[in-house]
């Protein structure tokens, strides 16, 4: 049985910027990508990433405490992938990640 490679797009959502990383599961390689400004062009810019990398899966980090604006914006971003593009999204608990 051969192992099939998957491409994963990881997002560190923020109300001003969204951190982005791409990963390949077969080799375990990861690559940070340029930060996306979270403005009116955010979904257009995310679409460009999708066209370039064609990920199989999207990971979105979920922080332990969120403001209402943060929660609403993150929900819109998740819905963009799930409802608009029919992509699988996994939310990752950030409770025990480091803080800067």
Language model features: what each stretch is:
Residues 2-11, 15-100:
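Phosphate- and other anionic-substrate recognition elements at nucleic-acid/protein interfaces
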């Amino acid at each position: 049985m051969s192992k099939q490679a998957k491409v994963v797009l990881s997002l560190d959502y923020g109300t001003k910027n969204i951190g982005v990383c791409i990963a390949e599961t077969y080799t375990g390689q990861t690559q940070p990508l340029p930060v996306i400004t979270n403005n009116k062009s955010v979904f257009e810019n995310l679409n460009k990433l999708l066209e370039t990398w064609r990920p199989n899966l999207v990971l979105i980090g979920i922080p332990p405490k969120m403001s209402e604006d943060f929660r609403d914006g993150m929900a819109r971003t998740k819905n963009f992938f799930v409802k608009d593009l029919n992509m699988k999204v996994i939310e990752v608990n950030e409770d025990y990640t480091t803080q800067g």
